[in-house]
């Protein structure tokens, strides 16, 4: 009796093995549908990722476009109001050796060819700023500022950027040494009055944190002996001229900038090779055309010492700043 009871108890406790382990599997059609749905999801995610990457690159391009436009607008004001007089020094502009007219003793000026990034300083009828605690009062403040542009390391990021100085001036120099200066005239040169003009002057401010390269050339005026042309000499040698003479031979200053956005700069560790890979301006040649040909080349990343991702984001911009054709005469 005990054996019979145990048999029926086990039979009741343990169900039929087929009924316990049999489960329904996926059909071939269901597997195919699942694979199609999965493929569609993968494609959608990939498309969203690609769209995000394109949008990110477009945003970086818009950032550099906007920065270049703002810089050029500021330069247009500065160059448009630049004093162009035969008795003012322009030796900070790029030029070969020059000889001043007999009016100024035929003084010889050394060549200033500026290999690498260019720089310049000039007087302009625009607002200037006084960094000291004092400034000229009333009519003692001159409506002229000393403007300068150069490429230098940004004090915050430590990377090359476009720096601008707008130094306020007085009609007369201040009694306190270094508080402010006045406009000086030939034969005195700007670098003599401001010895740290391009080397540590505290009045420089960053106006283009994406700019790492600056070059400019001169568009000479049409004359009976020569057609208008791009030149690194700011006077027409075919007319026998030997000095800038208030930009009397120059129709426009042509400024070319190279920019690299802040995001791309995070993977750049040296700008020396990058800067030298974009050649200096040359006579009869558009700097922007030469630079664009360089950055669009297949070997640019290698020659510039850049990661490919950063090299593809280098942008070139150029603008002509036409000068007033009426030369201002000296008193």
Listing of model-derived features with the role each one plays in the protein:
Residues 47, 51-55, 70-94, 154-158, ...:
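Alpha-helix exit/C-cap motif
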Residues 1-26:
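N-terminal leader/signal peptides at the extreme start of proteins
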Residues 87, 113, 199-331:
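Short linear sequence signals and composition-biased patches located at protein termini or domain-edge surfaces
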Residues 26-80:
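Aliphatic-rich helix starts adjacent to a transmembrane/signal segment
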Residues 2, 55, 271-274:
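Short secondary-structure boundary/capping segments
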Residues 98-223, 247-252:
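Surface-exposed loop/linker segments characteristic of extracytoplasmic
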Residues 57-58, 63-64, 79-116, 225-231, ...:
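Short, glycine/small-hydrophobic-rich surface segments
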Residues 31, 61-65, 139, 201-204, ...:
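Short, charged/polar micro-motifs that form catalytic or ligand-binding hotspots
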